Structures are given as C-alpha cells and as structure tokens.
Amino acid sequence: TFKTEAKKLYDSLLKAAEGEISKAKHLIIVPDGALWELPFQALINSASGKYLVEEREIFYAPSLGVLSALKSQTVSKTNQRNFLAFANSTRKDVAPLPEAEREVTDIGKLYAPSSIFVKTTATEKRVKTEAPNAKVLHLAVHGEINQTDPFESALLFTPEAGDDGRLTVSEILQMNLPDSLVVLSSCDTSNGQVLSGEGLLSLSWAFL
C-alpha cells in the first residue's frame, strides 16, 4: 500500500538523520537525481505514523550552492508594491486560463495596493518592467518545459510587436527581483533537467 511504501522510504532516506531532524522545526531538502520526483512531505515517520509535513515545515533547494547564496542575501529596504499578478495571457498556441484570472483577482483583493494584468495586458515586456517593484509576484500563466535546453524553458505571456511573449529561464536570470516572493501557478514549473553540481534547472530555480 501507499502508506507501507511511504514508511519504507522514510526509513531508507531519513531515519539515519532522525536525531538531527527531531531538533529542527524547518527541514530543507536538496534532492539529487530521481529524488526530485519524490514528495518528501508525503513520507511517513514509521515511529509516529505521521506524514513528514505534519511534523516539520518542508523546503526544497536546488543545490547547496544556491542555498548558501540565499542565506547570505540581505533584505533590501526599497519601496515595493505589495502584489503584482499576471494571468490568462492571450496566445494562439495554448488554451485560455479563465480560472487563473479569477484566482489572481481574488488574491489581489487581500492586498493593497495591487496591480493585476490579464489577457492582452499580460505581456512579457510588462513583467520585466513591473516585477522589480513587486513584493509578491504571482504568475498564473502557461509554462513550457524544454528538456533539451533548460535555459529555454519559458513562461508564456501575451506576445506583442517585437516580442514573442516567452519569458525564458535565461531571461529570468537577468531580472532584478529584490526579496520578492514569487508564486508560480503554472504546470511543470518545478520540472527540468538535473545537472550534476547544479541540481534541478527549472523555472522555479530561475527565480531563486
């Protein structure tokens, strides 16, 4: 059964470190290889019978290098807009996402001030211009994964003259997003190519 296998995996992967884990409230996991496909939070502590997520707050990091860099970052004091969202971009190559539009509209009501761009206004150019000023950046658009070249994986926005609307990993890495909380409400944003020493190169990795 699922629970039996979840307990076996817990014992194989985490039991040896149980003494250290028991002292911590937060657990940061840096998976390797096929372990990126494993939701550690669903493992079951064979002693307590509880899911790991019930006992600890679980976080993931793509590599130790990225984790170290994140820990050394300082918090900036810039004036940032509370909430910036993009949803339901208009494209011929993907289906519309009307529920994503409602999603960001409802969340935007909880923030003041907020700026929400949908359909034809949800452009790549506007993301690049507005995102550096956002405290919370919420992107509810289609994602496109390139397994051959992970730097060409992209979030899909509304195209306009001289702009294909594909915000690639390479482009995201060049953006300045000081201390922003980024929410990727898209399919496959945590999928990508696992490289030795670098970890998982994905759309979510690009925002770290």
Give the positions of each predicted feature.
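Catalytic cores of enzymes
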Residues: T1-L208
